[in-house]
Amino acid sequence: MKKCLIFALIFSIPLFIFGQSFNVGEKSLIYQDSSRNRPVKIEIWYPTYEIDSTFERITDLPFILNPTIRDATFIQKDFPLVLLSHGTGGNRFSLAWLAIALAKNGYIIAAPDHWGNTFDNKIPEYFVRYWERPLDISFLITKILADKSISQYVNKDKIGIVGFSFGGYTSLALAGANLECSLLKMNAKTPNGKKEFNIPELGDLTKLIEQISCDNVQKTFKDKRIKAFVALSPALGLGFNSTEQTKTIDSPVLIFGAENDNIAPIKTNAEFYCKLIHSSNFVLLEGKVGHYVFLNEASENLKKEAKKYYIDDNTVNRDTIHKKVEKEINLFFQKSFNK
């Protein structure tokens, strides 16, 4: 197990060092994974030259987001493709702030709803069916690359992923991190497990974890089409205990951890993953930064309704952190795709 070198979030990165800035188009699509009888609803953000002074709100939740142009024209060139995987009980808009920022810098972003694990479609057993999520992402890549209306604008040799929380695990699983199902079930019974698997979005998951039939779960989800991997406060570290589970990871990995994360504590998750993955770097968000800092900024009304997710400690500026995290991720993808 390697020593994890911890880097603080670099607040000295200039905000505009990455070249041309685009306007952002947006569209919604839905695919059907017939092999799993599973709908995969997605949102796509992409660079465009179109200009539109209107902003159509695309979600009922009052997030503070930069404007996008619905169904704008794509630019005739190929861009890197980045997949986003939301956290448990979130949805495809959970990381919209990051999607829009990356699209402005020349990426095509695709974010699915992980069916059964979204805020508006909560199916309890799907909150622990961890294998469905990487399968969603691999399915989505296949569909996008086969869809000529999108694939003609995608550089298939430059595909990356960013995941948050449960989505952070998803990103690492696609890199080649192989969760041990029986270990997860065993650790779910420990004090740490009972704490980590009692989540605000649904409550106690430990009984659902006990019901998983490990023999029927796919062992590895590595997708070689993805060349760079980012995990924001990744969860499910309790399913790992050995570098044998990560030995096939041969692509660059960037892991972010929040020092005050009490949902997926860094010692058993972000920092622990870093120790297991030889090709990873770890960026620590220091101070009173909590787990949900990676979610969108919310309006004042939503902050009142969902304080846990949208109100940070008064020493934490979510907008500032978002800007710096996006720049770190942008720089990471540029280095990874152009090495």
Where are these regions (language model features)?
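Domain-level recognition of soluble alpha/beta enzyme cores
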Residues: Q20-L83
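Short substrate-entry loop that stabilizes the transition state in hydrolases
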Residues: N66-K122, N262-P265
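Alpha/beta-hydrolase active-site loop
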Residues: Y126-D157, Y169, A173, N178, ...
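Acidic catalytic loop of the alpha/beta-hydrolase fold
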Residues: L236-L238, N260-A264, H291-Y292
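Short alpha-helix in the alpha/beta-hydrolase fold that links the catalytic acid
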Residues: S242-E244, S251, P265-S279
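Short beta-strand/loop motif that positions the catalytic acidic residue
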Residues: I249, I255-G257
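Catalytic histidine neighborhood in serine/cysteine hydrolases
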Residues: L276-A306
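Catalytic active-site module of serine/aspartate enzymes centered on a nucleophile-bearing elbow/loop
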Residues: S299-K339
